[in-house]
């Protein structure tokens, strides 16, 4: 008698669940629930569509396992997980605080061994100038500020120090032009102000007397005597020698002054022979002797008494 073999398609689905509990003595640690379906089908339309096709039977098994873990309960496990998270967050915050980088300053760099180096770039030579190594970043920044102010002046960009204020540039040509225009405006006055003047414009310069020592005075006097020894100053009271003048001194075309009274009377007598003036002139010449002293060639008349006499006569 022949035995036929039958093809069967077998499928198993397993699900595992862990439960945290403390099992008592004699209680199982694993619970397995198995369910087998010998007439399982893939879909409800398999029987209708495949009437003429050989159908392979299908068997499905569903297995569900519950495992009891020896340890704490679920609530204690959750509390422990929350505490662990808090510890991790605290550790992370500490790491962040310790890993904060120091503040960066202009012209300052930190060396691998911890110190700070400062350097600056010279714009004129286009080279870097080494300023030194410092313990703190602030010291290096101050060194950079001083060098920047020295090189760039008011235009320097600094960290702490304040650069000096720029000095104003004075244009001399503009200032001189303004002064000239102001002076010209002040000098323009009306014609009525010609006779007026400003007392403030006149400046008085006082000369201070300098006192010399006796030795200095004696040397100055000697120098003046030596300098005046070779000079001849004319005497203002001495009359010039007219005899040396010659004919050039007297102009023949111009008549000389009438110095003498007798000559005047002679001229009047010649011009007016029949007048009384000529007679009076003759009488006056007879009464008065008008002569000259040989030594000084001057008149011997007493001029002072003559004017006194006429003065009393008028009184």
UniProtKB/Swiss-Prot annotation:
GO cellular component: cytoplasm; nucleus
Keyword list, A-Z: Activator, Cytokinin signaling pathway, Cytoplasm, DNA-binding, Ethylene signaling pathway, Nucleus, Transcription, Transcription regulation
GO-annotated biological processes: cotyledon development; cytokinin-activated signaling pathway; ethylene-activated signaling pathway; leaf development
Highest taxon, organism lineage: Eukaryota
DNA-binding region: 104-161
InterPro entries registered for this protein in UniProt: AP2/ERF_dom, AP2/ERF_dom_sf, AP2/ERF_ERF_subfamily, DNA-bd_dom_sf
Gene3D superfamilies noted in UniProt: AP2/ERF domain (3.30.730.10)
Induction (UniProt): By cytokinins.
Subcellular location: Cytoplasm; Nucleus
Molecular functions per Gene Ontology: DNA-binding transcription factor activity; transcription cis-regulatory region binding
One Pfam family of this chain: AP2
Role of this protein: Component of the cytokinin signaling pathway involved in cotyledons, leaves, and embryos development. Probably acts as a transcriptional activator. Binds to the GCC-box pathogenesis-related promoter element. May be involved in the regulation of gene expression by stress factors and by components of stress signal transduction pathways.
Similarity comment: family membership: Belongs to the AP2/ERF transcription factor family. ERF subfamily.
Name of the protein this chain belongs to: Ethylene-responsive transcription factor CRF6
Record organism: Arabidopsis thaliana (Mouse-ear cress)
